[in-house]
Amino acid sequence: MILKGTNLSDTILGTLSDDELWGYAGDDYLEGRDGNDMFFGGDGNDYIVGGHGDDYAEGGDGNDRFDGGLGHDTFKGGLGNDIFDGGDGSDILYGGDGHDHFVGGRGHDKIYGGAGEEYIDAGDGDDIIYAGAGDDGFNNRIDPATGQLTQQAVGGGAGNDRIYGEEGNDALKGQSGNDWVYGGIGDDIVDGGDGNNFLDGGDGNDVLDSEGGTDEAHGGSGNDRIAVGGGNDLVFGDDGDDVLTGEGGDDQLSGGHDDDRILGGDGNDTLRGDAGQDVLIGELGSDILWGGTESDRFVFKGAAALSSQDTIMDFEDGVDFLLIEKLGVSQYSSSGASGTVYAYDTTDGDVQVVGYDSTGNAFSILVDDPNSVLAAANFSGSDFLFA
């Protein structure tokens, strides 16, 4: 049945079958009830309730509200600050222009934010989110569509989600599940949440974070900060002066181009500076350190340096430095006294660096030399920095 309103504010109720409801101009209330219904709100601030069935709705211009209910619904907001609740079912939601608010609900939803600043919570299910242009996701800000204070990022909810920030400075969070989260263009906050996640900051100075699970994170272009939680993670800084932190697990962290700072955290990690003048800090665990090209600093700091032995794989004499920090070491000396460090040759052809902190506790660093180009005689105080 085709049900038509006027250019005033109408209330139109559908039947138990498949209906077509037209609101025209005015602030209309359209409710489909049962059946696979079609809604056309027209101009004005409309409220569209799908009910049971697979419904299709266009809000038109104005600040519209959509309530999907049961069924696989398709809603299009148009111009205005629109509010979407997909309800149960695998829904497709289009925000259009304006600052829109999305709740996907249950089901495998697709959400397209469009232009403007969006709040998106995809809910349960394996969802796909395109945040669109604009600064999407909020942190202690007023949601333009609802007028409420919120701290919600663009969130995937439960399930294995794909989230695309596209343009703008976005806040994106995968939440639970094995998610793919892409920041796109802009200075984005990308949080994978729990699960085994793939994170890509894209262009811009991004902040990437993940919690439990085995994750892969790429900073992309820009000066990025990446921290991965528990799990054996892969981290790539790519272009820019990046800060990479492994935290828990046996991680592999690669700085990429430019001057990076890489911290292994807990676990037996592999750190690669790659191109640029990099700072590598293994922290806890028996770590493998590759400086890469240019002058790099290998840092051994505090109690972490005393707990285990790290291995430097590509130390270049006269180019790279060993920074001994917060151990009370102040000189290169073979005396074995507290506060000293020195090097000796091993029977395997490598170089062992041994030092003693201010209270006489020993620490050691292995300098691997597979090409037999280094010897303890190459080392002197000029290879060390003390702090």
Model-found features: residue ranges?
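Acidic glycine-/aspartate-rich tracts in secreted/extracellular proteins
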Residues: G302-L306, F315-Y332, S358-G360, P370-V373
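Intrinsically disordered, low-complexity coil segments
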Residues: F138, D143-G155, D357, P370-A375
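Low-complexity acidic/polar repeat-biased segments
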Residues: M1, G339-A387
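Short small/polar-residue motifs
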Residues: D10, E283-D287, I324-T346, S380-S382
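Short beta-strand elements of solenoid repeat domains
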Residues: I2-K4, T11-L13, E20-A25, Y29-D34, ...
